[in-house]
Structure formats: structure tokens, C-alpha cells
């Protein structure tokens, strides 16, 4: 992990939840503006479609072989994403490609855990898994593929755990 990333992770681990939210806003303000030369390019080539937030990432290979990235993201609406990018890009900008390649694959998870949002992410995943499990059970038990309205969740009464 690049030293600046390690420092950021450690910094967030020592903050209260309110302080973390304030720090996210501060980090989000550190993103550089996207230079004019990138603004006229087709953003589809630089969009990150996997992200729910609209993010465009513009790479710039410098004459000395180092990399510099610019990110277009609405930091006001998505301070967590902007802060994550500011920390990540702060570590890899103006560095050789090996620095970016050395970022651990679980960096996002480490960041989310350090920021204190890992549990929220896990909770959202668990809720989605539960909804999908209920939907699959309902589809399997309903002859027409639709569950009757007003029925209890598949597997039991409301609040009970469905068995798979």
C-alpha cells in the first residue's frame, strides 16, 4: 500500500463517525478539476459504468512515463466517492504505473471499512440477498410466477426468517 493510502486509512480509523463524514467532505475537495482538453472528449470512453454515481476517469501518461488521473464526479452529491478518488489518485498521480498496479485488490473494502461504511455496505448486500431469496421462493411456489398480494414473506410470517 502506498504510504499516503496507509496514512489515510489509519487517519479514518481514529475518527468518530461525525469526524469521518467531515473528513470525507474535506478529502472530496482535493480532487483536481478536469483540464479543458479532456472536457470535449466522448465521456463514454472514460465513464465508470459499474459505479452508481456518474464518474469519469481520465488517464494522462506523462512524457516521463508517470501517470496522472483526473476524475469528474459531483463531490457535493457523492462526497464518499470523491473522497475515495482523491485518496486513490493522491497515491498514484505522478508515479510510475507500478505504484497503481501495487494497490491491493481489496483497497475499496479497506477504505469502506476504515471510513466506517463497510457495515452499511454489507447490510445493503444482505438486504438485497434477502429480497432475492424471497423473490426466488415466491417464484418457485407460485404457479403463475406471481405471489398473492398481502401474503407473508416466503418461508413464514413477517419478521420470521425464510428457510432455504
Features from the language model and the residues they span:
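Extended low-complexity intrinsically disordered regions
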Residues: 1-45
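A short catalytic or substrate-binding loop motif that flags glycine-/basic-rich loops and adjacent residues
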Residues: 48-52
Amino acid at each position: 500500500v502506498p504510504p499516503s493510502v496507509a496514512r489515510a486509512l489509519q487517519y479514518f480509523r481514529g475518527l468518530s463517525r461525525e469526524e469521518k463524514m467531515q473528513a470525507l467532505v474535506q478529502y472530496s475537495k482535493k480532487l483536481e478539476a478536469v483540464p479543458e482538453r479532456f472536457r470535449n472528449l466522448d465521456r463514454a470512453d472514460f465513464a465508470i459504468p459499474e459505479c452508481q454515481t456518474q464518474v469519469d476517469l481520465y488517464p494522462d501518461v506523462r512524457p516521463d512515463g508517470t501517470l496522472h488521473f483526473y476524475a469528474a464526479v459531483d463531490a457535493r452529491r457523492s462526497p464518499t466517492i470523491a473522497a475515495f478518488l482523491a485518496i486513490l489518485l493522491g497515491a498514484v498521480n505522478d508515479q510510475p504505473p507500478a505504484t497503481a498496479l501495487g494497490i491491493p485488490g481489496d483497497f475499496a473494502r479497506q477504505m469502506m471499512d476504515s471510513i466506517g461504511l463497510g457495515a452499511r455496505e454489507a447490510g445493503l448486500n444482505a438486504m438485497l440477498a434477502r429480497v432475492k431469496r424471497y423473490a426466488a421462493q415466491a417464484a418457485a411456489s407460485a404457479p403463475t410466477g406471481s405471489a398473492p398480494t398481502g401474503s407473508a414473506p416466503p418461508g413464514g410470517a413477517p419478521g420470521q426468517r425464510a428457510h432455504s
